[in-house]
Design a protein with these regions (language model features):
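Internal, active-site/partner-interface "lid" segment
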Residues: 143-151
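Short, glycine-/small-residue-rich phosphate/pyrophosphate-handling segment
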Residues: 104-143, 157
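N-terminal beta1-alpha1-beta2 submodule of the flavodoxin-like/Rossmannoid cofactor-binding fold
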Residues: 1-77, 81-93, 97, 153-179
Length: 179
């Protein structure tokens, strides 16, 4: 099963990226992982550029191909001003018209210092609007740097929770009817 991971943060030393990197080391058997690195390459969403028959920009076509090929997603997003970063929302706006998305399972992670509940709620609303299957096993890891050990591994309690969330994603992918 193929999973696409997306960090909503553009920071080079992002806690959300560190959380995705930690998750990549805890994958259930049979799960492969690809981290999307192209948020900065996406042009601003303009519905005029996404009309039937018009070719979308290359960066958008690449994102769509990766999302369509994935059996599930993991999104780790910070919280900025009680919301989702604009770069992540922009990427999701480009994906709204993809007919292959409804029902795909998505696991949400958040490593914001204060817990990120506002961003999680906003992101969940957007993903539900896109008809994605949002897992209840979403995970927040406030103050993540305190939970990271030497080499970027999570402390055992946090690692167990993240592994359980990834197992729930794997189960949701297995339950989804073939497309």
């Amino acid at each position: 099963m193929r999973v696409l991971a997306i960090s909503g943060s553009l920071r080079s030393r992002s806690s959300n990226r560190a959380l995705l990197d930690a998750a990549a080391s805890l994958l259930p058997a049979g799960m492969t992982w690809q981290t999307y690195e192209g948020l900065t390459e996406l042009p601003y969403f303009n519905p005029d550029d996404d009309e039937d028959g018009r070719p979308v920009p290359l960066a958008v076509a690449d994102l769509r191909a990766r999302v369509i090929a994935a059996d599930g997603w993991v999104i780790s997003s910070p919280e900025y001003a009680h919301g989702v970063p604009g770069s992540l929302k922009n990427a999701l706006d480009w994906l709204v018209s993809c007919p292959e998305l409804p029902g795909k399972p998505v696991l949400l992670l958040n490593a914001s210092a204060a817990g990120g509940s506002f961003a999680q709620a906003a992101l969940a609303e957007t993903l539900r609007t896109m008809s994605l299957h949002l897992l209840e096993d979403s995970l927040t890891a406030p103050f993540l740097p305190r939970k990271l050990q030497e080499g970027g591994a999570l402390e055992p309690g946090a690692a167990r929770k993240l592994r359980d969330a990834l197992e729930a994603l794997a189960a949701a992918i297995r339950r989804r009817p073939p497309q």
